[in-house]
């Protein structure tokens, strides 16, 4: 599991280990091994580290939570496809263009936008779509593309584009938090990271998942203002007063 110490990765690693699988996890930090889990310290952005890792081991499954530039991914996706039975690429539901109903077949921004200035960038939604295309055009089919959206977990809380370190930490330190109110009226989905991890685990070794794409997102939606109210209610209960 590449970069498997985040919100989704932490849950997925535990699920796989509890199922009796031997799991290697890359991390930038030195972490203690646990039952069926071996942590390997290294920088996956360093392709020499990746080559060394794959030269020493053959993995039945590679699950990739890393965020690459398109140039970086172009240099390594063949390494992954050629050194595993099934490669999981974590994309994002942000690749989609606006639509009333979004499915895996819905148009992506990359496919429909005519904004040349935007297309000249490697913005997150574009780079993920381009990297999906590299896999699809590879003439290989031993990959599975996962498109989650906003997730939350014991180590991740989000509010629009803000992470907990930006707003909750400030509040707990006694400071006011600046919240972009224009975002608060927007609707989102928030999926528990463990639910995403459970779905990914069920796709491992599934031949029908090869070469396919899966949105793993809750069907329930919520306004960011309501999410903010939930956070404020919990903080008020903890702190004894309602934060600003």
PLM regions and their residue ranges:
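N-terminal Rossmann NAD(P)H-binding glycine-rich loop of SDR-like oxidoreductase domains
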Residues: 1-19
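Rossmann-fold cofactor-recognition segment
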Residues: 33-46, 66-68
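NAD(P)-cofactor binding segment of oxidoreductase domains
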Residues: 53, 57-115, 129-132
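Conserved beta-loop-beta element that borders a ligand/cofactor-binding pocket
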Residues: 91, 132-157
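Substrate-positioning beta->alpha
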Residues: 159-168, 180-205, 211-212, 226-229
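Mid/C-terminal beta-alpha module of Rossmann-like enzyme folds, strongest
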Residues: 202-244
């Amino acid at each position: 599991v590449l970069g498997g110490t985040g919100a989704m990765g932490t849950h997925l690693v535990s699920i796989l280990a509890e199922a009796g699988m031997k799991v290697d996890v890359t991390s930038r930090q030195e972490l203690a091994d646990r039952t069926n889990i071996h942590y390997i310290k290294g920088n996956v952005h360093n392709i020499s580290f990746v080559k060394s890792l794959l030269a020493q081991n053959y993995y039945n499954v590679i699950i990739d939570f890393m965020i690459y530039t398109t140039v970086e991914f172009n240099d390594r996706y063949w390494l992954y496809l050629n050194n595993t039975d099934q490669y999981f690429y974590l994309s994002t539901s942000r690749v989609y263009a606006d639509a009333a109903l979004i499915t895996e077949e819905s148009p992506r921004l990359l496919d429909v936008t005519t904004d040349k200035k935007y297309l000249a960038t490697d913005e997150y939604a574009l780079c993920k779509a381009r990297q999906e295309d590299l896999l699809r055009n590879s003439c290989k089919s031993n990959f599975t593309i996962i498109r989650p959206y906003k997730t939350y977990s014991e180590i991740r809380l989000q509010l629009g584009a803000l992470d907990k370190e930006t707003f909750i930490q400030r509040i707990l330190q006694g400071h006011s938090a600046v919240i972009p109110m224009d975002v608060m009226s927007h609707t989102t989905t928030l999926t528990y990271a463990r639910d995403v991890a459970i779905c990914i685990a069920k796709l491992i070794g599934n031949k029908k998942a090869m070469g396919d794409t899966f949105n793993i997102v809750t069907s329930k939606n919520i306004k960011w203002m309501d999410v903010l109210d939930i956070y404020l209610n919990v903080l008020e209960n903890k702190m004894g007063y309602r934060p600003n």
